[in-house]
Amino acid sequence: MDAENDSPLPKPQWIYRVGIGQDSHRFLSESSAKPCILAGVIFENSPGFQANSDGDIVFHAICNAISSVTHRIILGEVADELFHTRGITDSSVYLSEAIKSLKSNQMISHVAITIEGNRPKFLPKLSAMRQSIASALNIPLGSVGITATSGEGLSDFGCGDGVQCFCVLTVAEYCN
């Protein structure tokens, strides 16, 4: 008996797995030319993040949430290898690798994102961010939820030193 997958309960046609992911990065100096990218969307008038990659904390948090379901570490393993061997810094490539780690009978059915940071101003770009996430994950726009908070100065993120993101996603898995 495989303790991880066997259960005395009847096997349902669909099971649902929930993944959670987090990521955060500190801003570079204001004089940095590196763009600030969140969910694949460029935020003008804000410096980029201290990171080997483009620092897209939203895509990174989604990668980590997928990894919590698939048990394949993308950030820290796959992404590091892509960076060190091929110079790839685009977080959408890392997210594609995370999606490929899902089994053929698994699909992402919903994702919820929450972002904390005093800057940049998220509200004007939340719609574009939702669309970018839906496109990257190949799910309907209605299956993407996103919220943002300034943090009210209560943490380093709320004081404007960086940005933090949490992601919860649901993976539907078809059982034969």
Curated annotation (Swiss-Prot):
Annotated protein name in UniProt: 2-C-methyl-D-erythritol 2,4-cyclodiphosphate synthase
Annotated family: Belongs to the IspF family.
Binding site for a divalent metal cation: 23, 25, 60
HAMAP family membership: IspF (MF_00107)
Pfam families: YgbB
Record's keyword annotation contains Protease: no
Binding locations of 4-CDP-2-C-methyl-D-erythritol 2-phosphate: 23-25, 149-152
Gene3D superfamilies: 2-C-methyl-D-erythritol 2,4-cyclodiphosphate synthase (3.30.1330.50)
EC number, UniProt record: 4.6.1.12
Key words of the record: Isoprene biosynthesis, Lyase, Metal-binding
Cofactor details (free text): Binds 1 divalent metal cation per subunit.
Function of the protein: Involved in the biosynthesis of isopentenyl diphosphate (IPP) and dimethylallyl diphosphate (DMAPP), two major building blocks of isoprenoid compounds. Catalyzes the conversion of 4-diphosphocytidyl-2-C-methyl-D-erythritol 2-phosphate (CDP-ME2P) to 2-C-methyl-D-erythritol 2,4-cyclodiphosphate (ME-CPP) with a corresponding release of cytidine 5-monophosphate (CMP).
Oligomeric form and interacting partners: Homotrimer.
Enzyme class at the top of the EC tree: lyase
Swiss-Prot/TrEMBL catalytic activity: 4-CDP-2-C-methyl-D-erythritol 2-phosphate = 2-C-methyl-D-erythritol 2,4-cyclic diphosphate + CMP
GO biological-process terms attached to the record: isopentenyl diphosphate biosynthetic process, methylerythritol 4-phosphate pathway; terpenoid biosynthetic process
The keyword Metal-binding belongs to this UniProt entry's keyword annotation: yes
SUPFAM superfamilies named in the record: IpsF-like
GO molecular function, one term: metal ion binding
Classification via PROSITE patterns: ISPF
Site (Transition state stabilizer): 52, 150
NCBIfam families for this protein: ispF
Cofactor: a divalent metal cation
Metabolic or biological pathway: Isoprenoid biosynthesis; isopentenyl diphosphate biosynthesis via DXP pathway; isopentenyl diphosphate from 1-deoxy-D-xylulose 5-phosphate: step 4/6
